[in-house]
């Protein structure tokens, strides 16, 4: 589909939409230096520091899918807007998520938490190369050793739980 021209609704209409309909998003978990054996999994995972939504927390890269935008284009748009143009990655034209995350405005013990809305996050695990330059909502970007991640309280949206589930699938 190529470039997408954003189709915006008024702030008031968007707030009403979020109150009645779940938002579909892409969540991207960058990784590098993956080494896997029968007993161990070594890798680095990239996270952005952002206001989530009001406190600085480590989070996945992502955001909503725009009307008439393919998942491929949404992933590309989010990565470029958040990490800049000097990153490289390989992505199929019709990418399939490694996990489907659910976020609710009410805290639960199991699902993700987003006080702003009910959202469904199509989660992608992408091998990223090149120099990431945080921009947009990213206040910072950092590579973490997969065995030394931030504390659960330092993650936004309860994404530490989602990441734990995904790492068990790999």
Where are these regions (language model features)?
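Active-site segment of metal-dependent pyrophosphate-handling enzymes
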Residues: 84-131
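A structural signal for short, well-ordered beta-strand segments
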Residues: 28, 75, 124-126
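Acidic, metal-coordinating catalytic segment for phosphate/diphosphate chemistry
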Residues: 1-37, 114
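Residue-level signal for short segments within beta-strands and strand-turn junctions
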Residues: 30-32, 49, 128, 145
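NUDIX/MutT-family hydrolases
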Residues: 121-127, 133-169
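Short, charged/polar surface micro-motifs in flexible loops or helix N-caps
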Residues: 33-37, 53-55, 66, 103-105, ...
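Conserved Nudix-box catalytic region and its N-terminal flanking loop in Nudix hydrolases
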Residues: 39-86
């Amino acid at each position: 589909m190529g470039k997408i021209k954003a189709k915006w609704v008024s702030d008031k209409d968007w707030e009403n939409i979020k109150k009645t309909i779940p938002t579909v998003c892409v969540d991207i978990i960058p990784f590098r230096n993956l080494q896997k054996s029968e007993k161990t999994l070594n890798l680095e995972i990239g996270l952005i520091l952002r206001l989530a939504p009001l406190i600085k927390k480590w989070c996945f890269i992502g955001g909503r899918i725009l009307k008439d935008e393919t998942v491929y284009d949404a992933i590309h748009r989010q990565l470029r807007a958040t990490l800049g143009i000097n990153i490289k990655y390989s992505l199929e034209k019709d990418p399939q998520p490694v996990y489907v995350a659910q976020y609710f405005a009410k805290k639960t013990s199991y699902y993700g938490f987003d006080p702003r809305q009910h959202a469904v996050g199509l989660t992608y695990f992408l091998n990223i190369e090149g120099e990431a330059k945080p921009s947009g909502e990213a206040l910072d970007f950092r590579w973490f050793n997969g065995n030394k991640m931030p504390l659960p309280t330092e993650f936004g949206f309860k994404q530490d739980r989602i990441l734990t589930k995904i790492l068990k699938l790999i």
